[in-house]
Amino acid sequence: MGLNENQRYAIEKYYYEMYYALLAYAKSALNERSLAEEAVQDTFRIACAKADDFLSSSNPNGWLLNTLKNVIHNMIRSR
């Protein structure tokens, strides 16, 4: 099942608000822009897949950052 219109709008809002901050964090952890971009995109893919959990979180920005940290950890571990 896909996102409803309200979920899509809310996630887009977080994308535009948080993308560059998340990218900066990922670049500092991964030392490569293309990998950092991939990590941030994976983070938002997960946010879309878990939209109910993400959007009902008491701290959506923190949810995104924690998800990004997990994505980065998995990327580093799989190298």
Residue positions per predicted region:
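Arg/Lys-rich amphipathic alpha helix in sigma70-family domain 2
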Residues: L55, N66-R79
